[in-house]
Amino acid sequence: FDKNGKPMLHFVYPLRTISDDATIGEKIAFYRKKRNLFGNDLANLIGIDRVTMIRYENNQLDCPYDVIIRISEALNVDRHLLMDEYLQFIDYPYSVFIKQRRKELHLRQCDLGEQLGVTRRQIERWEHSVNIIPKEKYHKLKDIHFIP
């Protein structure tokens, strides 16, 4: 009751949050639902089919970097909120990091390529942002302690 003896109503709303270890798919679904959109609505907004969106949200398909960017723009959220560590590495920009780190370690492109099982030309293409480094090669970079 307030000071005049009238009953006061208190509304309690559940605070929707997402865990720090949520998958990319869980993050997409969380922010989509927060914007009151259905999966096919978001799919249409970013130009993909509904089934692909479902597969992203169910973690049945890796969501590419460019799609994460489109999703974040459609949902009006910071793109980093949707990214895992691999996509954050790609966003860094990875090309600058790879070249700088390789030089810090006094490695030639062919030396790094040999450690990763790729050609010198592929390292060069990554360093010039011609190709995006695949997720498995990112993990290999971590395994060989190239990424601190």
List PLM regions with ranges:
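Recognition helix of helix-turn-helix/homeodomain-like DNA-binding domains
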Residues: 47-62, 87, 118-132
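A short, Lys/Arg-rich alpha-helix, primarily the initiator
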Residues: 5-34, 84-104
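Primarily N-terminal secretory
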Residues: 2-12, 45, 73, 80
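Helix-turn-helix/homeodomain-like alpha-helical modules used for DNA recognition
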Residues: 91-132, 136
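Conserved hydrophobic/aromatic packing and binding residues within compact polymer-binding modules
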Residues: 28, 42-43, 53-56, 82, ...
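DNA major-groove recognition helix of helix-turn-helix/homeodomain DNA-binding modules
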Residues: 66-81, 135-148
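Short basic helix-loop element that most often maps to the first helix and adjoining turn
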Residues: 26-45, 70, 96-111, 140
